[in-house]
């Protein structure tokens, strides 16, 4: 689960992380009121959307001006005018997709005297099975760009969860960033607090970009992004309250209500599969045969007819879907249940795209019989390669 920048800073503040004073606003009037409570005379107006690259982004609407989604201003009047331009406008960034995201709230924050910009993040490294600190002197840039062009500028520090973070971990990272004197002590306190926050909130990624060193030597997170493990949210009702469903994909949101693992992609062939590994293999072979998957969808091993029907409806709600491939290996999941769910959904939504079904496993013959007797134009496949070839061919012929 993702949260907004201002919410992330609220979480960090609870752990003693120094953050600049600021407040969220939903109208230009509220934005000006927040600014009046800040020290000034420099303020930063920040669009709040679940996408990175806001500062380098652009708005679709000419009325929003030609500046990005993060603007430095020098008066409360400018706070008002810029907030008015941004609120309700559509911000497009390299992470939002071409459709962009509507700005429904802005964060007004005190400006600061920036001497250096650094990069810092904590994440779970599956290669080392440890929480790992990633740091770079190239703050303010996309870390992917740094990794591609200057990988030597990224420093990694793994932390064994059995022992937790220690002073030497913090000093290693501080020295890699070129910090010195009192800055090292300030950074040690900061990183220790970030690690505690990361582990106690079941965070999956905590990114600060940039982490700035101010003119008076303070080390402060200027921007912050936090993602949380959705499987652990039941332990954090306070974090769940930060969820902004308006920022989530409508289809992914609907899928979550039915305990379906769904991720929207850019292709035209919808996929419904049981098991994450088989789902990824299915997407791979669709690409291999010349198609492009429209989604990742794992219905799980214990799906009911109703759940399968819901999955089918979600796939068909994507206007980009020109064909569907159902690939089921029935172990715990029975093939007859899948067949009944697919047929029920196809009839309910008036299926008008090619449908290829590959069934194997428990009750497979019964499942195939149910589909044949349904009278629906379902294309049966014998194996995964055959299924991928048939759905790609059917989509091309139908277009």
UniProtKB/Swiss-Prot annotation:
GO molecular function terms attached to this record: ATP binding; magnesium ion binding; succinate-CoA ligase (ADP-forming) activity; succinate-CoA ligase (GDP-forming) activity
Reactions performed catalytically: succinate + ATP + CoA = succinyl-CoA + ADP + phosphate; GTP + succinate + CoA = succinyl-CoA + GDP + phosphate
GO CC, alphabetical: cytosol; succinate-CoA ligase complex
Pfam families to which the protein is assigned, alphabetical: ATP-grasp_2, Ligase_CoA
Domain ATP-grasp: 9-254
Residue ranges crossing the lipid bilayer per the database entry: none
Gene3D superfamilies: ATP-grasp fold, A domain, ATP-grasp fold, B domain, Succinyl-CoA synthetase domains
EC numbers, comma separated: 6.2.1.5
Recorded metabolic or biological pathway in which this protein acts: Carbohydrate metabolism; tricarboxylic acid cycle; succinate from succinyl-CoA (ligase route): step 1/1
Disulphide connectivity of cysteines: none
Record's keyword terms, sorted: ATP-binding, Ligase, Magnesium, Metal-binding, Nucleotide-binding, Tricarboxylic acid cycle
Lineage top rank: taxon: Bacteria
Gene Ontology terms: biological process: succinyl-CoA metabolic process; tricarboxylic acid cycle
The record's free-text note on cofactor binding: Binds 1 Mg(2+) ion per subunit.
Root EC class: ligase
Cofactor(s), by name: Mg(2+)
Residues given in the record as substrate binding sites: 274, 331-333
Family classification: Belongs to the succinate/malate CoA ligase beta subunit family.
PANTHER family referenced in this protein's UniProt entry, alphabetically: SUCCINATE--COA LIGASE [GDP-FORMING] SUBUNIT BETA, MITOCHONDRIAL, SUCCINYL-COA SYNTHETASE BETA CHAIN
Subunit text: Heterotetramer of two alpha and two beta subunits.
Function: Succinyl-CoA synthetase functions in the citric acid cycle (TCA), coupling the hydrolysis of succinyl-CoA to the synthesis of either ATP or GTP and thus represents the only step of substrate-level phosphorylation in the TCA. The beta subunit provides nucleotide specificity of the enzyme and binds the substrate succinate, while the binding sites for coenzyme A and phosphate are found in the alpha subunit.
Protein name from the UniProt record: Succinate--CoA ligase [ADP-forming] subunit beta
Native source organism of the sequence: Rhodospirillum rubrum (strain ATCC 11170 / ATH 1.1.1 / DSM 467 / LMG 4362 / NCIMB 8255 / S1)
């Amino acid at each position: 689960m993702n949260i907004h920048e201002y919410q992330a800073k609220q979480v960090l503040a609870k752990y003693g992380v120094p953050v600049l004073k600021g407040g969220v606003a939903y109208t230009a009037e509220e934005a000006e009121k927040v600014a009046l409570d800040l020290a000034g005379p420099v303020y930063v107006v920040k669009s709040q959307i679940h996408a990175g690259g806001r500062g380098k982004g652009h708005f679709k609407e000419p009325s929003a001006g030609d500046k990005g989604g993060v603007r430095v201003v020098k008066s409360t009047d400018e706070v008002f005018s810029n907030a008015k331009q941004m609120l309700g406008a559509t911000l497009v960034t390299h992470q939002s997709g071409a459709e962009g995201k509507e700005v429904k709230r802005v964060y007004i924050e005190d400006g600061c005297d920036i001497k250096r910009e650094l990069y810092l993040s904590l994440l779970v490294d599956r290669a080392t099975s440890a929480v790992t600190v990633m740091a770079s002197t190239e703050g303010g840039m996309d870390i992917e760009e740094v990794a591609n062009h200057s990988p030597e500028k990224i420093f990694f520090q793994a932390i064994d969860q059995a022992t937790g973070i220690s002073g030497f971990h913090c000093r290693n990272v501080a020295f890699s960033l070129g910090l010195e004197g009192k800055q090292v002590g300030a950074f040690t306190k900061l990183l220790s607090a970030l690690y505690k926050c990361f582990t106690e909130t079941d965070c999956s990624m905590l990114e600060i970009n940039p982490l700035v060193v101010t003119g008076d030597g303070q080390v402060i997170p200027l921007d912050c992004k936090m993602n949380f493990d959705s499987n652990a949210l039941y332990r954090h009702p306070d974090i769940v309250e930060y969820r902004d469903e308006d920022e989530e994909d409508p289809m992914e949101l609907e899928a979550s209500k039915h305990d379906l693992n769904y991720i929207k992609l850019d292709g035209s062939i919808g996929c419904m599969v049981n098991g994450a590994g088989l789902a990824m293999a299915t997407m791979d072979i669709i690409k291999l045969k010349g198609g492009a998957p429209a989604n990742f969808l794992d219905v799980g091993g214990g799906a009911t007819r109703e759940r399968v029907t819901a999955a089918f409806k979600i796939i068909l709600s994507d206007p980009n879907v020109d064909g569907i491939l159902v690939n089921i290996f029935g172990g715990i999941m029975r093939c007859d249940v899948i067949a009944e769910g697919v047929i029920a959904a196809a009839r309910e939504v008036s299926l008008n795209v090619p449908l290829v079904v590959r069934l194997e496993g428990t009750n497979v013959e019964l499942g195939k019989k149910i589909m044949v007797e349904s009278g629906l134009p379902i294309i049966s496949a014998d194996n995964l390669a055959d299924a991928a070839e048939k759905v790609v061919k059917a989509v091309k012929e139908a277009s």
